[in-house]
């Protein structure tokens, strides 16, 4: 005999929540379907567990699944599952109190917002999945008919309009063999959720990897398997590639696939892919990065940025865990210890996998580096993983024949000369600019390899690392030429006639003259021990930042002044030897000043500090005019 409908009042916190839901507008109302499907999936999981224990269930031959249908004329959306079902008491407990279908954090936040505006409280609810009650975002009446898996239990129907009360009565009419059927009578402003394409879109977005078939009007929607849940040995490269293409809409296979399954310190599984093509650090769309976070195969957040650091933001993929509640908010995610532990563990796994790739296939790693190295270098500030990060860096260097060559820091050290304890580098806009920089000449002569830092971030990376494997990073312009003299020349000996004692003294006076001519424009003028083929160069005073770093900082601070540097001249260069002869003959000869200023201006130009190229051009024209006159006189023209 059917029981008469019994009316019950919701608990206070549920009434508050339902009031806000039914009197507010939501921009993310689609989550109601995610919540209902997730509940159905949980019910099916519970049934599977019960059957695995050998317990008897009602309708054992009933196939597991979730069916969704619509009745547009009656404005009814139906979600049915063949899961564990509920008894009358379970309907009362599970659908009558928020403690069973919401979160403790939600209750606390709702209480704090009791005196706030509806909009403020609504934002609290909007940040949380609130389980079954989310259906009242779109429905003004809900009927839940459920039959438990337990033999002999009758089916019951729970009904509510979301206004404070609900009824429970024994079910009549169309009763499920087992499981739960939810009929949501949709409000007029929720008509979109009666459209098949809209329902399918929501399911593909949030629930496409649910392990049970989800059908809409008889057609299965979730046809893509949750590949990360499958044993690694059973998955082919083609399956991984197909899944990557499905996930990212890319047309090419990934460069690398990492299938992760971790049980401690936190449980999670995942698939992480290295895309075949990279992005520029400051390109459009670079802020769209992160892994998709799933909880028990249900999408919680796309592009979650807490699962990986930004320097691994080029990675695409999915992380799935059972250690998080389904209704966790985005704000709570950022502070959640489980998410933090997943991120720390996953970062170590990715770095270890890249290290294996670098060791096993240098060419494949070089391909990875050329595509993603610019973003990867942002990891210079990841102090916790510095020892794993630094060996993965790659740079072009003077060891290579062209700009395509790449060397690791370990490779550099393996080629270091005996007694060398520095990793030398120079920052430049291109390889040729670095190779032809006057300050590199002594390193070429001594057979000392120099890293070419061709990206603005490179210098930040090395300065932050400071050292590697007992070798300190040092810019070539900070080199002490006299200390470099300890290394023997590796090339042919230079054919240079040494200055006589008188010439040496005269050159010292020439240096003083040049210093007087340049005045406050320079910190000092001195003889260079680093130049071989160039007549002059500028170097930073001891302890100062490099030229490239100084220029960058001046741009940031809008400082257009020219820094005072040390002007070094090569007394063995023909220009300086000829200038010495002119100076010895007539210290006041205009050519001394013209040549000094010309050498200084060209050095400024090479260092990136020349403010007025017209002045340099005028000096060049004057010297060309004079040299033309001398040439005519010598040739008797």
Swiss-Prot record:
Source organism, top-level taxon: Bacteria
Keywords, ordered alphabetically: ATP-binding, Chaperone, Cytoplasm, Nucleotide-binding, Stress response
B: annotated segments: 331-551
Any Pfam family hit: HATPase_c_3
Region described as A: spans on this chain: 1-330
A Gene Ontology term for the protein's cellular component: cytoplasm
One GO MF term attached to the UniProt entry: ATP binding
Residues covered by region (C): 552-637
Cellular localisation: Cytoplasm
PANTHER family: HEAT SHOCK PROTEIN 90 FAMILY MEMBER (PTHR11528)
Stored NCBIfam families: PRK05218.1 (NF003555)
Subunit structure: Homodimer.
Family, similarity comment: Belongs to the heat shock protein 90 family.
Function text: Molecular chaperone. Has ATPase activity.
HAMAP family in alphabetical order: HSP90
Name the UniProt record assigns to this protein: Chaperone protein HtpG
Originating species: Nitratidesulfovibrio vulgaris (strain ATCC 29579 / DSM 644 / CCUG 34227 / NCIMB 8303 / VKM B-1760 / Hildenborough)
